[in-house]
Amino acid sequence: MILSKLITKKPDLKVLIVVPTTNLKEQWSEQIDDLGYSLNCEIQVINTVVTRDWTVDLLILDEIHSFLSTTFAQVFVKVKYKLVLGLTATLERLDGRHEICQKYCPVCDSVPITECIVNGWVSLYKEYLVLIDVDDIDKYK
């Protein structure tokens, strides 16, 4: 994990991990506990982060595609950071707002989905094409 390497080099690093859900907050907490390091680290749900100002050395945004709505993009204003790491498996958005990510947190590395599946980082999945009639869209507006 990137955090363990950073902590060995910079043990005083102040880290803020931002997640979209409480489930992910719990998962991160468990993973950090498993590292066995004492970290100067907070894990917060995005709704909490955008309500106040923060100053950290490292900002980690898990599921960064979730932070690109107008409201949640405020994380880039509310948090003062030296380094930022965004994590996602689905960066591109139909509304084009993934361009915000390129401004604040440009892609520096990616892993092909085949490698992720082989290593057990993602589960097997199926893609389905679901055709809908334009009239159906109007029904649900």
Tell me what each language-model feature is.
Residues I2-I32, T71, R93:
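Conserved Walker A/P-loop ATP-binding site and its immediately adjacent core
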Residues I2-S4, E30-D34, V56-D57, A73-V77, ...:
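Short, glycine/charged-enriched secondary-structure capping and boundary segments
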Residues T8-K10, G36-Y37, T51-W54, F76-Y81, ...:
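Conserved catalytic network of the ASCE P-loop NTPase/AAA+ motor domain
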Residues K14, N40, T55-L58, K80-G86:
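Loop/turn-to-beta-strand initiation segments
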Residues V18-T55:
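Inter-Walker segment of RecA-like/P-loop motor cores
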Residues C41-V75:
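Conserved RecA-like ASCE ATPase "motif II neighborhood" in helicase/translocase motors
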Residues H65-Y125:
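Post-DEXD/H (motif II) to motif III coupling segment of the RecA-like Helicase ATP-binding lobe
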